[in-house]
Amino acid sequence: MSTPARKRLMRDFKRLQQDPPAGISGAPQDNNIMLWNAVIFGPDDTPWDGGTFKLSLQFSEDYPNKPPTVRFVSRMFHPNIYADGSICLDILQNQWSPIYDVAAILTSIQSLLCDPNPNSPANSEAARMFSESKREYNRRVREVVEQSWTAD
């Protein structure tokens, strides 16, 4: 059955394959267009450099009118990422707009890695460290990056 959400996701997938943003990949899981796996590579020349971070995106039939549920599957240490991998990002909540596609969502999350918002912490320890001890914060991020190489 082809619904508006499924048609839109097929378009998003085609666009992502034809013109992938740097450091991002994503595709539907098996034969389910409503459930995607994605990978964000840590941006160059940042503490996240070299990391490979896996995410899952769950879409509803209300997409693109409602945002997907996005979670990091990889372990993360970041002010705006909860312990369960869910992400505190305005475009995934109150600032969502149907103009955002999968590429825009993943690009925004990649940007968030390097530009956290410590005023809206999902991980208070990471937010405190980011604000008070950038060196220690960067060390913890590097640990997460190294773990991303061996995680399955």
From Swiss-Prot:
Ranges where the UBC core domain occurs: 4-150
Pathway membership, UniProt: Protein modification; protein ubiquitination
GO molecular function terms noted in the UniProt entry: ATP binding; ubiquitin conjugating enzyme activity; ubiquitin-protein transferase activity
Factors inducing expression: Not induced by heat shock.
EC number: 2.3.2.23
Top-level EC class: transferase
GO biological process terms held by the UniProt record: protein ubiquitination; ubiquitin-dependent protein catabolic process; vegetative to reproductive phase transition of meristem
InterPro entries according to UniProt: Ub_conjugating_enzyme (IPR050113), UBQ-conjugat_E2_core (IPR000608), UBQ-conjugating_AS (IPR023313), UBQ-conjugating_enzyme/RWD (IPR016135)
Top-level lineage group: Eukaryota
Enzymatic reactions: S-ubiquitinyl-[E1 ubiquitin-activating enzyme]-L-cysteine + [E2 ubiquitin-conjugating enzyme]-L-cysteine = [E1 ubiquitin-activating enzyme]-L-cysteine + S-ubiquitinyl-[E2 ubiquitin-conjugating enzyme]-L-cysteine
PROSITE patterns per record: UBC_1, UBC_2
Tissue expression pattern: Expressed in all tissues examined. Lower levels found in leaves.
Active site residues according to the UniProt entry: 88 (glycyl thioester intermediate)
Keywords: ATP-binding, Nucleotide-binding, Transferase, Ubl conjugation pathway
Pfam families, alphabetized: UQ_con
Family per record: Belongs to the ubiquitin-conjugating enzyme family.
Its job: Accepts the ubiquitin from the E1 complex and catalyzes its covalent attachment to other proteins.
Protein name per its UniProtKB record: Ubiquitin-conjugating enzyme E2 2
Gene source species: Arabidopsis thaliana (Mouse-ear cress)
